[in-house]
Each structure stands twice: as structure tokens, then as C-alpha cells.
């Protein structure tokens, strides 16, 4: 990773004179951010060449950014447009004050794309099924949404790198995003019934809507493609032997996500829930 010069580098704990001063975050959003930051620090900071304890040097920045994203996510769930929210403006102002907005903007845009896709899919899933072409398009949108969903982790990776004067390579970011998506897939499988009841986005639900009971054979084919992408990206990311050992051990200790990431813990393969076929899907929202 390329290093910034000492003159360019800002201490991670230094505030910016342009930091936002108006309150834009709820306690609820900050509480949600806590688990994300802990998992990010323990699972991914060592892959960026940073000790886990270094999170304390810029915890305020991580909490503000992650909390802002959760605030926007809650607005999206209420049907609002996150891109125009005060929390979005404050987040951009915060990043710009640290010279990081240009580095992070494209990844923030992925988040706004995810929220747009999520709103569209939830609305479409309330309606009766359409013809095959229409349903195929919805499934493609759901797969794209799955790839975008963990954009918050990508934002945190770029934030930590920027605050510590590092540049994350394209290959490393592709690898991290592949990791993030497999974890999201595992979460969607575990949360399938709960998400069905809540009317929340779930990529497995998208496969069930399109294929019915055959989703249990169709979705593993798609997951296998994602796992191969992960393995290829991992090979190209330039991990040291110690980083690779850490990464696999962390995956095993977490019990997932899937045999490509945790060969021993997931030796039995992916566990897909029984599809819910009544397809009153999301009609209670």
C-alpha cells in the first residue's frame, strides 16, 4: 500500500474545522453501528495492515460514518430518499474535511444504488408475479443488490485507509467486497423467515419468488459463482501468509460464510431453508 508523506498525513484523531455541528444521528443508529465496527475491526483491519487496537485512534470517525449510514438506512426503510437527507450532507461534509470524499464517493454511490434497488424490489414483490422476463429482471436486480448491500464495510475500509495514509489496491477492494457479499448471503439464508415476516430485502427470497421450490438448487449455482470470484480475488489480493492464515482462522471461528471462506466450519456446504411458497411475499408491509 502506498504511503502518504508526513506533511500530507493528518493524525486520525484530529478534528476538521469544517466538521458538521448540527445533530443528524440517533442513538439507535449509533447502537447499530457498534456491532458493525467491532466486526470490521476484528475481521478486516489486519488485512489492511493495521492492528485491531488501532480502531481506538479513530473510533469517533468510524462511529460517525457508520452511524450516518445506519441513519440513512432507517430513512430508506421508511420510504425516504437517503441521498437528500441531512445525514447524507453531514457525512459528505465530514469526509470532505478530511480530504477523503473523492476516495469514498463512488462507494457511497453504491450504497445509494442499493437503497434504490431495495425500494424497487420491495414494491415489486408486493405485486403478483409477472411474466418470465419481468421476474428474471427482478432477480438480476436482487443479485446486484446483494453485491451492493455491504457497501458500508467498503466505506469503512476506505475510511481507515485514508485516515492512516494508506491506499487500498483495486485487487484488495475486490477481495474485500467478495468477502462481504458471501457474509451477506449467509445472513440472508439465516434470516430468511424473519425477513419474510418483516418484508425486508432477502436475496434467497428473490430466488424463491422466481423459481419456487427449485430455488434450493438454483441458488447454490449462483453462490458457487460468487465463491469462485472470492477465491480468484483472494489469490490476486496479495495477502501475506500471515494475513491469509488470520483470515481463514477468523472465518472458521465465526462459523462461515460457506466452504470457500471456512472449509472446516462449513464442510457440509450451504444450508438453505425450506422455501416459503405461499407467496403472500411482503404483502404485509
For each predicted feature, which ranges?
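C-terminal domain/tail detector
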Residues: 1-23, 92-99, 225-285
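P-loop/Walker A phosphate-binding loop and immediately adjacent motor/lid segment at beta-alpha junctions
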Residues: 9, 15-24, 28-31, 207-208, ...
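Active-site/pore-lining binding-face segments in mid-to-C-terminal subdomains
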Residues: 170-245
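All-alpha helical catalytic cores of prenyl diphosphate-utilizing isoprenoid enzymes
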Residues: 23-47, 54-68, 75-196, 243-248, ...
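Flexible helix-coil transition and linker loops at the boundaries of alpha-helical arrays
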Residues: 50-51, 234
Amino acid at each position: 500500500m502506498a504511503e502518504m508523506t508526513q506533511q500530507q498525513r493528518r493524525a486520525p484523531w484530529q478534528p476538521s474545522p469544517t466538521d458538521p455541528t448540527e445533530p443528524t444521528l440517533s442513538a439507535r443508529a449509533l447502537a447499530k453501528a457498534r456491532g458493525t465496527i467491532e466486526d470490521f475491526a476484528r475481521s478486516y483491519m489486519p488485512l489492511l495492515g493495521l492492528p485491531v487496537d488501532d480502531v481506538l485512534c479513530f473510533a469517533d470517525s468510524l462511529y460517525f460514518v457508520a452511524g450516518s449510514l445506519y441513519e440513512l438506512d432507517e430513512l430508506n426503510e421508511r420510504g425516504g430518499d437517503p441521498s437528500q437527507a441531512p445525514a447524507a450532507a453531514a457525512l459528505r461534509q465530514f469526509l470532505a474535511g478530511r480530504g477523503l470524499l473523492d476516495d469514498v464517493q463512488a462507494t457511497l454511490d453504491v450504497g445509494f444504488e442499493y437503497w434504490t434497488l431495495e425500494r424497487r424490489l420491495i414494491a415489486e414483490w408486493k405485486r403478483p408475479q409477472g411474466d418470465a422476463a419481468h421476474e428474471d429482471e427482478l432477480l438480476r436486480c436482487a443479485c446486484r443488490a446483494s453485491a451492493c448491500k455491504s457497501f458500508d464495510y467498503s466505506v469503512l475500509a476506505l475510511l481507515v485507509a485514508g485516515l492512516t495514509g494508506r491506499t487500498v489496491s483495486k485487487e484488495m477492494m475486490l477481495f474485500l467486497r467478495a468477502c462481504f457479499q458471501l457474509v451477506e448471503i449467509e445472513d440472508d439464508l439465516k434470516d430468511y423467515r424473519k425477513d419474510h415476516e418483516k418484508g425486508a430485502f432477502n436475496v434467497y427470497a428473490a430466488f424463491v419468488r422466481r423459481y419456487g421450490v427449485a430455488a434450493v438448487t438454483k441458488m447454490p449455482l449462483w453462490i458457487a459463482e460468487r465463491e469462485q470470484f472470492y477465491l480468484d480475488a483472494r489469490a490476486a489480493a496479495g495477502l501475506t501468509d500471515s494475513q491469509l492464515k488470520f483470515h481463514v482462522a477468523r472465518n472458521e471461528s465465526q462459523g462461515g460464510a460457506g466452504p470457500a471462506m471456512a472449509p472446516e466450519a462449513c464442510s457440509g456446504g450451504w444450508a438453505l431453508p425450506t422455501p416459503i411458497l405461499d407467496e403472500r411475499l411482503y404483502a404485509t408491509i
